[in-house]
Amino acid sequence: GLPVTTSEQIEETHKAFEAGATLAHIHVRNVDETPSSDPSLYAAVQEGIQKHCPGMIIQFSTGGRGRDQAARGGMLFHRPDMASLATGSVNFPNGIYENPPEFVDGLASEMLKYDIKPEIEIFDLAMLYNAANLIERGLLKAPAHVQFVMGIPNAMPARRSILEFLISELKAVMPDATWTA
């Protein structure tokens, strides 16, 4: 099942590391398996991964599933290597993943303050332009890293033609950016 406890997360991450993984995207959970924003849980997972998976890139989730906006960036002071940053809102099947502009600006500022590389999550084309605007305003550093999130219900379908278009637009607005999908 889903690794829930700190020790389970560290153990499963170590297995992935041994198999060749170089990056761990971390969501922490409460004992009842609901999403958590508890900075101490993030710190414990981070410490365990650093100890057992030397050199692995640690990326914290700032995602909003069931988490209060005020708490979503509350763990960034632990200075992970990377953290997710959705640059706009999207309709998920079970609700709205809310990322209003002032909230995105605040998370971006915190990542800049702690020298955290954002993984810019792009669920639609507007979010790509929002990310470019964050760089123009000095809230993100170039070169950016973009994650095109595709194949999720109510977001972009996972189609080659769409990805090729997104890459073309990325090169136009952030020519030095790296990307994954």
Question: What do the PLM-derived regions correspond to, one by one?
Answer:
Residues 82-181:
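Catalytic alpha/beta core domains of metabolic enzymes, predominantly
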Residues 2-14:
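Short catalytic helix/loop segments, enriched in acidic residues and glycine
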Residues 17-18, 76, 112:
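Non-catalytic positions within long, well-ordered alpha-helices that form the structural scaffold/packing
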Residues 34-60, 106-113, 164-176:
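Alpha-helix-loop-beta-strand connector modules within alpha/beta enzyme cores
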Residues 21-31, 58-62, 121:
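Short beta-strand segments at enzyme active-site cores
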Residues 22-45, 92, 149-154:
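Glycine-rich, proline-tolerant flexible connector loops at the mouths of alpha/beta enzymes
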Residues 9, 16, 27, 83, ...:
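Conserved, mostly hydrophobic/aromatic
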Residues 6, 36-99:
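Active-site beta->alpha loop and helix N-cap motifs at the rims of alpha/beta catalytic domains
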